[in-house]
Design a protein with these regions (language model features):
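Conserved small/polar residues in nucleotide/adenosyl-binding loops
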Residues: 164-173
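N-terminal lobe of the biotin/lipoate ligase/transferase fold
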Residues: 2-159
Length: 174
């Protein structure tokens, strides 16, 4: 997880101010590194209040902020989404996941994009994937079970999604 994602996660967890010193100690970085990460988050649309002798406080975020740090800071999983690859635009998250699998990626790889230029749906049909309207993703799994059980994976995944604790402001990513 990137330092930006870690800082964002900590700011979300605390409902009060988090001192710059606490962030430095927690992540083993300098005050300058924290300040730069906070600056990047602000540029991405997060409203972070900085008060001298108090620290930083996440006040709000723009509704359309979806990036790798944001998604990583919300994942509360041990292996799903680790690693996470985020792209502003990609041909297809599925194609990228297949390439990563061929190169030995671990089960749980999550490929996420704001836009797909060659997205595919069921039976290889074209999938409209315009930027700014949704988050598109492929979760790569390498299940350790008999192929006869594969059809049950859809049901299991549907149940897992229904129990998830990951919710974003516009319910675009579950």
């Amino acid at each position: 997880m990137s330092m930006k994602a870690k800082i964002l996660e900590l700011l979300r967890e605390k409902e009060t101010y988090v001192s710059g010193q606490e962030l430095c100690e927690q992540f083993g970085v300098s005050r300058t590194a924290v300040w730069k990460a906070i600056g990047q988050l602000k540029k991405e649309g997060y409203v972070i209040e900085a008060v001298q002798n108090k620290g930083y406080h996440l006040v709000d975020q723009a509704e359309e902020v979806y990036n790798q740090a944001d998604i990583q800071s919300r994942l509360k999983t041990k292996w799903v989404g680790h690693p996470l690859l985020f792209f502003d635009s990609i041909d297809s998250t599925n194609i990228r996941a297949k390439l990563e699998a061929e190169q030995g990626a671990e089960s749980g790889l999550l490929v996420v994009a704001d836009q797909q230029t060659a997205g595919r749906g069921r039976r290889g049909r074209g999938w409209e994937s315009p930027s700014g309207s949704n988050i598109y993703y492929t979760l790569m799994l390498k299940p350790d079970f008999n192929a006869d059980c594969a059809p049950m994976l859809t049901l299991v995944m549907a149940l897992a999604v229904s129990y998830t604790h990951l919710t974003l402001p516009t319910s675009r990513f579950v």
